[in-house]
Structure formats: structure tokens, C-alpha cells
């Protein structure tokens, strides 16, 4: 392998989460029964005219900004002409000549090293119908036909399966944080076509590429690329020809299977879409499209706050969770992250719910932490109180009083109680000079027992120490 350089290019198809399709008013719902969300425009019925979904354009601008791209000042659509059963119109509306974004880049951090991925273009287009097998027959679900998607095309500069899977994962995270797609590979809302080739080191000429499709997980992306690299390497060292083909990854057998041979470049006879006029994008409109904090920015902010690495990954992979976490206004982010995950997220997991579905208000968590900080409740109380915050409409003070969880911090009261315990247990207390820790624990245990665990442990420990040291000095 040392004699050959791996060259990988990736095309990602990212379905956008708009409420309706790109060019028709048909709603989008992944869970809907097959062929129930189909409009005459989706099927190309005569006399139908497309109407552009504005939100799809906005989502395209968001992604272009996130990928540091040059955004075109005009939106042009083109027809890609070909026949296939999943394309009833006989053409796909896409952006061949004037993509919405060009010349971008994305920096990855892999094993503490930065890797820059060059992105050639992103363009908007409509999705095709979904093909599936049912009762040994091929069926088509046209619910997917017309869903807006963005195709993201890298330059052939990716060097390994690890870089490739990291890049796809970063695009997935960006899409989630921008809230433009659910980016689920298992559902097909994020699909990646991988082009792999090898060439001798020092050569400027690209080798014959092999395309890999049907990859439904990041793990399969790595496996498929590594298999293809190994196959091409063996052919090259044995002076065998590499044929340009399209392959798919057979997950069951963990092998690559050839789908079809690419004998020549297909002529799609692109031409401008006659039914959609050119859309001018004013700079003011582009400037008003704001993007959320990106994954690397969010990661850096959490790292600076000393949040656990595992928690950081969970937050970055779940924008809904990170948005909820960030609403909690508390300076010690490390402390709140430990409580947030060990108590709130753990409680949600037990109930098979998302943490946000518990309806625990961020302000209630803040108030609870203030009570803990001020010594009004203990850590044990906090653990007991978290479940009570689910759907809570009461003030925290009211909740504490109802459940008798406010700690006793009155020093006069606690001192009197401690003196009573010492007087009633003089024999044990007399052992203080020989067994200070044992005597102290005994008195504190008795105090907690007499106050039903309400004595403030910090204040109580301090008072017991002061009283005993004064008595035996």
C-alpha cells in the first residue's frame, strides 16, 4: 500500500426537513403509508407547474454558509433528463450549471490533527421515488418523489476511510445543528455515494474510480471503503485492470457486490428548467439568513467548560438536548453537566423518553442548584427532587416545604441538639481523644436521626468539631 495513494470523493444527498415538497404543496411525512402523499406535480401530470419552496432555498443558504462557500446571487434550475421508474416526469429538476454554493471547505479534527476537506459545490434538487422490495416484487413509494434535497460534492481529496466517515459524520452534525434535516442514514435522509481510486504516489493522474452506493451507516462506510481499497491494491500489484463500476455493500455477507458497469458517461441533456424563472437573491436576504453555532464551535465551548468528553459527544449529536442544556443558566457548566446527565437524562432513559419530554423547566433546575449551593438542601435531596420536577407547576420553595426537604441550618438549634446528644452519651463521647472520627460520626448520625435527615451536614459537622474540641482541649 505504501506505493499507492488513496483518492476518495464523496457525494452526499441530504433530504431537507421542509413541511412540504420542493415544487408541490404535498406534505412530507416519513411515517406515512406508501403513496399517500403524492401531488400531480410530483408525478408530472400535464398542465401542472412547479412552485419553489422558499424554505428549501433558505436551508441551502444556511448550509453554504456553514461550509464557507460562495453563494450565487441567482437561483437557476435545470432539467436532468433520463428514464427510470422512480422518476415519473422523465426528468429531475436540479442545479447543474449554477449551483447555490461553490468552493467551500470543512475542517475535521481527527486524532487531534486538523484535516481540511475541499467541497466543490452544493446544489438543490428534488428527490426521486423510493424503491423497495415487497413479496419478491419491486415497488415504488412516490411519497419521497419531490422532497427537496441538497447534494454536497467534495473534490477528490479525501485520503482514507477514517477521513471519509468523519467527514460524513460532520456533515450530519452540521445538518442537525442547522435544523435543516434529520440526517438519518438508516432512513435514507442522508445518503452517500463514495468514489474510490488508487494512484502511484507522485502521479497527477487519477486512477479508475469505483463508486459505492447503499451505505446506511458510518461503520459500513469505513468497511466498504477499506474493502475497495484492498481490492484495487491487489489488482494493481497483479497488473490487473480496474473496471469502472458501481458497487453496493452487502451488509449481511460483509462484501462488495457489483451492481452495474459504467461503460460510458451518460448524457443527461441538461437544459434550463423552462417553468421556473431565475430567482434573484438580494445580498440583504442572504445576510438575514442566520446559522446556529457549528459542531466544532460548540465542542470547543464545552471543552473550555471542562465538560466530560462523553457528555460533549452526546450534546453535539443531539441538538434538541444541547439546546435544553444551554438554557440552564448556571456558571459551573461542569457541575451542571454531571447533574444533568446523571439525574435528568438518566431519568428520561428509564422512562424511554427524551429529556425534553420530561417538561422539567430550566429555571427549576437553576433554582434547585441555588438551594444546594446555599446549603438549604443536600445532594441526596436533589436526587429525590429531580423526579418531582417532571411537569412541575409549583415554586421550588413550595416543593421543598411540601416534601420537608429544607435543611436545618439554625446554629442555635443544632448546637442545642448536639449538646443533648453529648450529655446522653457521655461514655461514648469520653473516647474522643482516642477515637475522634468514630465519636464525631456517632454524634452526626444521632443528629441526623433526630432531625429526620434535615440537619445541614456542613453546618452540623463544623459545630460538632467546635464543641468537641472545646470540650477536650
Swiss-Prot record:
Keywords: ATP-binding, Ligase, Nucleotide-binding, Protein biosynthesis. One of its GO terms (molecular function) is asparaginyl-tRNA synthase (glutamine-hydrolyzing) activity. It catalyses: L-glutamyl-tRNA(Gln) + L-glutamine + ATP + H2O = L-glutaminyl-tRNA(Gln) + L-glutamate + ADP + phosphate + H(+); L-aspartyl-tRNA(Asn) + L-glutamine + ATP + H2O = L-asparaginyl-tRNA(Asn) + L-glutamate + ADP + phosphate + 2 H(+). The keyword Transmembrane does not apply. It is an enzyme of class 6 (ligase). One of its GO terms (biological process) is glutaminyl-tRNAGln biosynthesis via transamidation. It holds the Pfam family GatB_N. Its EC number is 6.3.5.-. It comes from the Bacteria. InterPro entries: Asn/Gln-tRNA_amidoTrfase_suB/E, Asn/Gln-tRNA_Trfase_suB/E_cat, Asn/Gln_amidotransferase, Asn/Gln_tRNA_amidoTrase-B-like, GatB, GatB_Yqey_C_2, Gln-tRNA_amidoTrfase_suB_CS, Gln_synth/guanido_kin_cat_dom. Heterotrimer of A, B and C subunits. Allows the formation of correctly charged Asn-tRNA(Asn) or Gln-tRNA(Gln) through the transamidation of misacylated Asp-tRNA(Asn) or Glu-tRNA(Gln) in organisms which lack either or both of asparaginyl-tRNA or glutaminyl-tRNA synthetases. The reaction takes place in the presence of glutamine and ATP through an activated phospho-Asp-tRNA(Asn) or phospho-Glu-tRNA(Gln). Belongs to the GatB/GatE family. GatB subfamily. NCBIfam families: gatB (TIGR00133), PRK05477.1-2 (NF004012), PRK05477.1-4 (NF004014). This is Aspartyl/glutamyl-tRNA(Asn/Gln) amidotransferase subunit B. It comes from Mycoplasmopsis pulmonis (strain UAB CTIP) (Mycoplasma pulmonis). The gene is gatB.
Amino acid at each position: 500500500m505504501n506505493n499507492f495513494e488513496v483518492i476518495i470523493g464523496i457525494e452526499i444527498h441530504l433530504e431537507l426537513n421542509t413541511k412540504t415538497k420542493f415544487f408541490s404543496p404535498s406534505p412530507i411525512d416519513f411515517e406515512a403509508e406508501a403513496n399517500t402523499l403524492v401531488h400531480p406535480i410530483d408525478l408530472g401530470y400535464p398542465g401542472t407547474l412547479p412552485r419553489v419552496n422558499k424554505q428549501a432555498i433558505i436551508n441551502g443558504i444556511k448550509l453554504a454558509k456553514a461550509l464557507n462557500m460562495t453563494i450565487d446571487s441567482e437561483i437557476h434550475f435545470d432539467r436532468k433528463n433520463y428514464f427510470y421508474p422512480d422518476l415519473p416526469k422523465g426528468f429531475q429538476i436540479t442545479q447543474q450549471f449554477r449551483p447555490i454554493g461553490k468552493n467551500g471547505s470543512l475542517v475535521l479534527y481527527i486524532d487531534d490533527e486538523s484535516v481540511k476537506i475541499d467541497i466543490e459545490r452544493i446544489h438543490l434538487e428534488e428527490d426521486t421515488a423510493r424503491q423497495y422490495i415487497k413479496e419478491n416484487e419491486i415497488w415504488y413509494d412516490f411519497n419521497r418523489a419531490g422532497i427537496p434535497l441538497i447534494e454536497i460534492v467534495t473534490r477528490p481529496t479525501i485520503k482514507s476511510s477514517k477521513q471519509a466517515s468523519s467527514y460524513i459524520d460532520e456533515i450530519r452534525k452540521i445538518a442537525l445543528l442547522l435544523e435543516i434535516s434529520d440526517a438519518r442514514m438508516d432512513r435514507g435522509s442522508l445518503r452517500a455515494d463514495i468514489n474510490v481510486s488508487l494512484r502511484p504516489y507522485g502521479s497527477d493522474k487519477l486512477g479508475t474510480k469505483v463508486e459505492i452506493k447503499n451505505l446506511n451507516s458510518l461503520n459500513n462506510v469505513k468497511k466498504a471503503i477499506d474493502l475497495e481499497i484492498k481490492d484495487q491494491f491487489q489488482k494493481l500489484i497483479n497488473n490487473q485492470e480496474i473496471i469502472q463500476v458501481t458497487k453496493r455493500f452487502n451488509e449481511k455477507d460483509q462484501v462488495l457486490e457489483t451492481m452495474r458497469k459504467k461503460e460510458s458517461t451518460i448524457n443527461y441533456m441538461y437544459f434550463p428548467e423552462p417553468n421556473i424563472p431565475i430567482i434573484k437573491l438580494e445580498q440583504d436576504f442572504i445576510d438575514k439568513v442566520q446559522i446556529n453555532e457549528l459542531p466544532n464551535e460548540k465542542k470547543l465551548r464545552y471543552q473550555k467548560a471542562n465538560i466530560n468528553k462523553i457528555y460533549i459527544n452526546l450534546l453535539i449529536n443531539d441538538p434538541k438536548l444541547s439546546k435544553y442544556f444551554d438554557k440552564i443558566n448556571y456558571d459551573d457548566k461542569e457541575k451542571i453537566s454531571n447533574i444533568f446527565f446523571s439525574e435528568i437524562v438518566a431519568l428520561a432513559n428509564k422512562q424511554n423518553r427524551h429529556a425534553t419530554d420530561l417538561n422539567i423547566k430550566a429555571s427549576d433546575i437553576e433554582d434547585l442548584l441555588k438551594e444546594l449551593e446555599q446549603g438549604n438542601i443536600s445532594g441526596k435531596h436533589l436526587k429525590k427532587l429531580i423526579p418531582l420536577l417532571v411537569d412541575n407547576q409549583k415554586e421550588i420553595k413550595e416543593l421543598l416545604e411540601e416534601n420537608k426537604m429544607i435543611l436545618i441550618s439554625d446554629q442555635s438549634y443544632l448546637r442545642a441538639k448536639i449538646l443533648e446528644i453529648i450529655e446522653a452519651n457521655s461514655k461514648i463521647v469520653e473516647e474522643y481523644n482516642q477515637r475522634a472520627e468514630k465519636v464525631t460520626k456517632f454524634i452526626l448520625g444521632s443528629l441526623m436521626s433526630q432531625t429526620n435527615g434535615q440537619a445541614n451536614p456542613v453546618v452540623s459537622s463544623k459545630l460538632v468539631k467546635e464543641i468537641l474540641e472545646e470540650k477536650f482541649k
